[in-house]
Amino acid sequence: MNTALLDAMKEAPGVARQSLLPNGSVLRPARIKDGVRIQALVNEHASKGLMLPRSLNQVYQSIREFTVVEHDGQLQGCGALQLAWDDLAEIRSLAVDPKWQGAGIGRAIVESLLAQAEELGVPRVFALTYQGGFFAKLGFRPIERSELPRKIWVDCIDCLKFPHCDEEAFIVDLPNRGGRPRQDGVRKALVADVPEMAEIINHHAANGRMLPRALSHLYRNLRDFWVFSEEEHVIACGALHVLWEDLGEIRAVAVAPERIGRGFGSAVVEALIAEGRALGLPRLFAFTYEKGFFSRFGFRVVDKESLPRKVWGECLDCPKFPNCDELAMVLDL
């Protein structure tokens, strides 16, 4: 496994914002161990009507979208970047411990999230907020909520104020429209990779080997994916989806049909396993027809009924449910 890739998992883009923080405070990507503290901080602000509350399940499933600041093991602030499509992402769940407000923590988190958006290749980032002055200082400009595409309202449907939202909409255009270079080898997925990822996955889905993926699903879950790229083209991909503090699923592992059997899928799975360890997950599982392939990495077959019910959420959309003919395989990390 490329050590540079592992190092990249340990730091949030925009760590130069560290200089904005109080002495001893650390800006970094969230990990599984942060889930309970993130939920508590977000819901403290939600109880005051400042943002939507988050269930622990929602926090764990979106843990890679979060950046946090901590000091001596205490969470000082958090914020998340959620992709909406190839041209738009949202900053959400931005919360700072009241004891640390005004210390530059919120600004450092937002600047890190914007740096992440630039690296992914997202040209615009918006926020729905009551803190318009704060976002204006960071280069955001106000817009009418009606100017935002309808797809961003999915999350808002759960809000008690919907459709009479009283938050202001702010948006910023980012200078780097292309994202980081599409380097050859195994790496985290970028916005520009999604069309080719969809083509590869849906080719195998048409043959009954996995679930199909809509572009909207791939954009919203882009942080789950790794790809193997060659000459700026995706030839393999796969995702690690966090389900809870103790379990993640390897899914959508697919290789371009003309490149199967050359080790590209293995390279992606190795990256997914390494990321699972870096996040702090104790166990991974996969539903698969490829027993031999996953056995190479230490996965073992288990009874499907031994897995918790929460793993079946996505299966409800499968035409084979509940008569699944895939094997359940697990790996203890």
Region spans (language model):
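Conserved active-site alpha-helix within GNAT-family acetyltransferase domains
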Residues: 123, 129-157, 282, 288-315
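Hydrophobic adenine-recognition pocket in adenosine-nucleotide-binding enzymes
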Residues: 30, 94-96, 189, 253-255
